[in-house]
């Protein structure tokens, strides 16, 4: 089944394939399994296993439950910004067939913190550890304020917050890397 889905997605440009994957994952067609031997504890957070998915796939919290059902013990959504934004102009996702890889230059495209918060409010039970990756809007005049606003708004809906300071596609962001 998985090979069939991957084969099907290759007929689309990478960004459309990403959107289709998000839609499929949001339907929760998958089942999960637990293996007690793989339980991992980090800083008082218990993970079902040591495999997590970093931010970038589910940018706006649309399908993280489906991702948990694939077997990931943690999912990080985002990068979420205070206001929704479109990100960089297309094309911004490129397949490297020989390397079996993808390069993305999305630029923090997401629905914004209020929309993400409303999605998280609808979830009654999570099937794993949820992180939220946060960043400033592309045209922000005060990125530090953006981080503060988002962290305060979304931290109670997640197990942890990750602060994104390394996107080369967001002007001035890498200045925070020190």
Segments predicted by a language model, with ranges:
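An N-cap/entry alpha-helix motif that binds or orients negatively charged groups
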Residues: 2-40, 104-109
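Short secondary-structure transition/capping segments
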Residues: 13, 86-90, 174-175
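Active-site cofactor/substrate anionic-group-binding motifs, chiefly glycine-
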Residues: 47, 63-85
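Active-site-flanking structural segment that lines cofactor/substrate pockets
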Residues: 25-62
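A gly/proline- and charged-residue-enriched helix-loop-helix capping module
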Residues: 78, 82-127
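Non-cysteine beta-strand/loop elements that form the S-adenosyl-L-methionine
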Residues: 76-88, 155, 159-166
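Conserved alpha/beta-domain cores
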Residues: 47, 55-58, 109-178
